[in-house]
Amino acid sequence: MSHSVSLTFPDGSVREFAPGTTGRDVAESISKSLAKKSVAIAIDGELRDLSDPVTEGRIEIVTREDKRALELIRHDAAHVMAEAVQELWPGTQVTIGPVIDNGFYYDFAKNEPFTPDDLPVIEKRMREIIARNKPFTKEVWSRDKAKEVFAVKGESYKVELVDAIPEGQDLKIYYQGDWFDLCRGPHMASTGQIGTAFKLMKVAGAYWRGDSNNPMLTRIYGTAWHTQEELDQYLHVLAEAEKRDHRRLGREMDLFHFQEEGPGVVFWHGKGWRIFQSLVAYMRRRLEGDYQEVNAPQVLDKSLWETSGHWGWYRDNMFKVTVAGDDTDDDRVFALKPMNCPGHIQIFKHGLKSYRELPVRLAEFGAVHRYEPSGALHGLMRVRGFTQDDAHIFCTDEQMAAECLKINDLILSVYEDFGFKEIVVKLSTRPEKRVGSDELWDRAEAVMTEVLKTIEAQSEGRIKTGILPGEGAFYGPKFEYTLKDAIGREWQCGTTQVDFNLPERFGAFYIDSESEKRQPVMIHRAICGSMERFLGILLENFAGHMPLWISPLQVVVATITSEADDYGREVAERLRDAGLTVETDFRNEKINYKVREHSVTKVPVIVVCGKREAEERSVNIRRLGSQAQTAMSLDEAVASLSAEATAPDLKRKAERTARA
């Protein structure tokens, strides 16, 4: 006799159902309207088809409005896109089509690659298929049957996928009407539930299975959302992001470029290097007093990287150099450092340390190199050579909480100086594969959980916090700091990571109050992370309209007539003496032409001088993005612009001095 199936509902109630009861049956037992709105079920958090028999556990009925339904909407849209393509271009082979962030894609094998002009045609056919409202149904096939059917259809890529599935394992085949595909599922009840809030975005080339030795396929990307409003908002953000693309701004503002001879490394132009150095100078000032700035070697012997563990698990991403030995020595293998931490441990170990000297805080604007795949490179955001605003704190167990809070205060203060208000701090806890005892992890996670509570309490609701279970590094738990930019995108930047691994590997120790050797806690800390990436984020956040204090070129003095050139030189000199970065434009061009030209390069302030201004010893100030003009005396302009161009930390320092 079959036992009933026990299901626990979100309200805590428990009900018994007969074996073979489907998710749809359960929904109908609650209400007809719920069954009509439902698109899937979740058993213990795992999404399943409505047609699946339920199994014992916690059940949730998933409706189309549920956030989890978005993955199903996108998955189903991918299948409908594949059907549309094969209806329009018979003989096209369908390969794989997963859901990705904000959308989906499918890879197709076609004699002539798709072009952007094909996308509206495919979209139109997709809408027709959705309107047919065909049910998604599932069959289970044997491996042999699947190979035979796909071979007859000429789907050689599907045959290869089936071959990769273990012997004896049954395969799921999903139908929508007569069209079918190999798929793990789940899917919604019918194509009609996808809705019409979708759009095909672009075509691209993609090698089969990501291997350049395999044939090139055509990948079609799409996006799909619950509602048209959500789709419109997403497309608006994409359009804004394109206008704000830091690579485009880098060209327009003459900041940097990349070229084939140095893939993934930045060629900084004069203005770009100026803004980069301004960022470094600001960060360096924020470290004064609390940190020792150090500098570790760029190139270190393989043996050090073997000790650190990088050689074992990161070697393929390291730039390696082999140096020929002489007659008595073998060749030596060196590597460019991908991280600063092993070098900082060597500095900490140089000389005996007492507990009275702790915490020791070592900081470095360290140039690191990592061999990223060429396809992953993306302007300043993903490079092979970059600068980390790295620091490592060596402290006692008892000092760890205070150090984490101190780091948190610094990170939040830096983000606020750059105008970022929406910050999320999350604690990543122990992963399955890790070093260190459970007792060590218990203690560290308990301390960091209390720190997280303190961060939330002190922020009075301004800072959101959360937990990322199992997302910690193998060597210790960590805090991740994510900031939101002007168009709502999230960027993970800062980290605070506790490390049990490296101090042990390198035998780092201090002498405690009992004259015993103790292993220090090592805390990795980064605020910007990659300085290059953070600069890219700033450029996109401000759309190139950088705050005056961090702008690469702060003022252009432009004259209306040659009669004002001498006065223009005096104005420029006064502004330079006040600490501003100034260029002059005395060309024989109309002033509106000059203003437009400098606006394209995102100069924040244009100081206009004509004959009248020279006579009155005044200036006319025009701001980037504004039609307004402000007239003021030269003395007022120098004082006002000088104050505005002062970095936030220097303003605070001046205010403290004035109060003292």
From Swiss-Prot:
Gene3D superfamilies reported in the protein's UniProt record: 3.10.20.30, 3.30.54.20, Anticodon-binding domain, Bira Bifunctional Protein, Domain 2, Threonyl-trna Synthetase, Chain A, domain 2
Keyword Cytoplasm carried by entry: yes
Gene Ontology CC entries for this record: cytosol
GO BP, sorted A to Z: threonyl-tRNA aminoacylation
Cofactor binding, per record: Binds 1 zinc ion per subunit.
Subcellular localization(s) per the UniProt record: Cytoplasm
Class of the enzyme per the UniProt entry, highest EC level: ligase
Chain segments carrying region Catalytic: 245-547
Residues given in the record as Zn(2+) binding sites: C341, H392, H524
E.C. number(s) listed in UniProt: 6.1.1.3
Residues in TGS domain copies: 1-64
Gene Ontology molecular function, alphabetical: ATP binding; metal ion binding; threonine-tRNA ligase activity; tRNA binding
Keywords for this protein: Aminoacyl-tRNA synthetase, ATP-binding, Cytoplasm, Ligase, Metal-binding, Nucleotide-binding, Protein biosynthesis, RNA-binding, tRNA-binding, Zinc
Catalytically driven reaction(s): tRNA(Thr) + L-threonine + ATP = L-threonyl-tRNA(Thr) + AMP + diphosphate + H(+)
Cofactor field: Zn(2+)
Pfam family, one: tRNA_SAD
Quaternary structure note: Homodimer.
Function according to Swiss-Prot or TrEMBL: Catalyzes the attachment of threonine to tRNA(Thr) in a two-step reaction: L-threonine is first activated by ATP to form Thr-AMP and then transferred to the acceptor end of tRNA(Thr). Also edits incorrectly charged L-seryl-tRNA(Thr).
NCBIfam families, A to Z: thrS
PANTHER family: THREONINE--TRNA LIGASE, CHLOROPLASTIC_MITOCHONDRIAL 2, THREONINE-TRNA LIGASE
Record family assignment: Belongs to the class-II aminoacyl-tRNA synthetase family.
UniProt protein name: Threonine--tRNA ligase
Organism: Sinorhizobium medicae (strain WSM419)
Taxonomic lineage of the native organism: Bacteria, Pseudomonadati, Pseudomonadota, Alphaproteobacteria, Hyphomicrobiales
Gene designation per UniProt: thrS
